[in-house]
Amino acid sequence: MSTETETHLGESKRVILSSLIKQLSPNKEIKHMVLPCFLLQPRSTLESFTDMFTYIDELYKINEIDDEGERFLQFVKFYLTGWHTRPKGICKPFNPVIGEEFECFWSNNKNEDLPHIDELIEDNNSDVGVFKAEQISHHPPLSAYVFYNKFQKILVNGNICPSYVKFMGNSAESHLQGILEFNFFKWNECFECTLPTVGVKGIILGKLSPFTCGDIEIKSKNSKYSCKLEFLFKGLFGSSKNINGIKGTILYDNKPIYKVRGNWDKQIFIKKINEIAGTHGGSSSGSHTNSTERCLMDVSLLKNSKEKYTKPIEQQPPNSSYHLWELVTKNINNNNDKETAEEKAKIEEKQRKEESERREKGILWEPKEFHFKENPNNEYKTTFYYNDIPKLFDNLQSKPIQ
């Protein structure tokens, strides 16, 4: 059974939290509120998007599967591996400033590869994963990112815009709006997925703990497979089964073929639906009877074989997350709330001043690494794509996305 991650606050911090709550009205969006420093993670939201790639080998395994039904199941598994990897507790990462960038890498040998990383990422035969993110706008807080591995022929384009936090009385939540596109050029296949709602509950009553809830959809743009999942929410009096619970359906041609159940921090199971079992759903599942559940994901068996790493901070640009938030991060790690608040305020004031100057001069902010492309066929119309996509995969017959 899954368990909630409870956060214990000292009396002084509870008093600060209570004073903040008194300023809020239930069911209202929180657009302007400075969080106390003890509620901050020592990292930027841009870096937090890499949590999804913690078990990157599960992503690469998709390339090894011939059957399209099994590939889809493997992608669903990969999608679900990223949720339990977030830092425990109720702290949230920094809100990125406009123009902020974050870059990191995955490869088999960090120590050997890092000194030559710029050359390696240009080499089509080097198995290196590259992640780049940029903060596109501040209001709304839109972030865009790209992940690519030229050797694996995988490209991911992500656009995420967290909604303003909504205070619900005993909880506060934010829906992660946006679309993630995963391209596997070996199979000429693209999977598209949405994101759930994240938040904190137990603000007034019960355990103070994080939660994930809401509906998401995963679909193949090249086959008839799709998946609808619900991240379950356990309220003050809800069933303990709903703690980090998930349920849903995997479909083929809009017809259910698997039921999904479990907990994303423990195990997730799929079970064929009898009426149409055996018609679709992947060749390797043939050894399972219609009444037998199959374990799609077991967190205890996942292996983190490739370490995420970044260039040394002195080699990063001034607008990198590590540069911008260096002093804030240092003070959070030293439990120095006063210095944290002062350094954070300096960054936010600088951003406000620069935005005001641009408005006065009529200058529109232009992203450096991404460009806007209207996507009428996409539920999420405001989509930004990485500028260098055509250069990355110019050896392929069909140009990706663009």
Curated annotation (Swiss-Prot):
The source's superkingdom equals Eukaryota
Q: What cellular component terms from Gene Ontology apply here?
A: cytosol; membrane
For the region Disordered, what residue ranges are annotated? 333-366
Q: Which GO terms describe its molecular function?
A: sterol binding
Give the compositionally biased regions (Basic and acidic residues). 336-366
Q: Which family does the record assign? A: Belongs to the OSBP family.
What is the protein name for this chain?
Answer: Oxysterol-binding protein 12
